[in-house]
């Protein structure tokens, strides 16, 4: 093998070995104002109904140029009581993520949080896809109804004092 080919092979291997590190290093940017309203849908479909988004209770995070995590509460007043009991809002991710200790594929989902801080993720048909035990943040004095916050090198989703 010539020196030029050896150097080319070595540099190619080095570039490809650093690619996952570069993808993981994408900084989380919290979206606000106009940037937030551009990515958060005005309403969300769930179990045959459309509920308007509560923009005051919406949050989004961007990683790099095209990866987003979006969450918002939805006005469920037009839903039946059994749907309102399990569905509080929507959660959208355009790439595979780890949600708590479980993997979640790219997609748009409904979510609800139980009194025991269990985060439940549903498909738009209302079928439970995963359930993750959350924790309580008792140090927060005035919790927001919904928030996405950068924590410990990742992003936490808060529903009141409960988070995952």
Regions found by a protein language model. Give the residues of each.
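Short, intrinsically disordered, low-complexity terminal segments
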Residues: 1, 19-25
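Bacterial N-terminal signal peptides that target proteins for export
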Residues: 1-11
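Conserved short hydrophobic patches within well-ordered secondary structure
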Residues: 2, 108-111, 157
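Intrinsically disordered, low-complexity N-terminal regions enriched in serine/proline/glycine
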Residues: 5-6, 44, 108
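Bacterial N-terminal signal peptides
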Residues: 9-20
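Primarily secretory-pathway and cell-envelope proteins
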Residues: 24-82, 130-164
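Mid-length scaffold segments of soluble, non-membrane domains
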Residues: 76-125
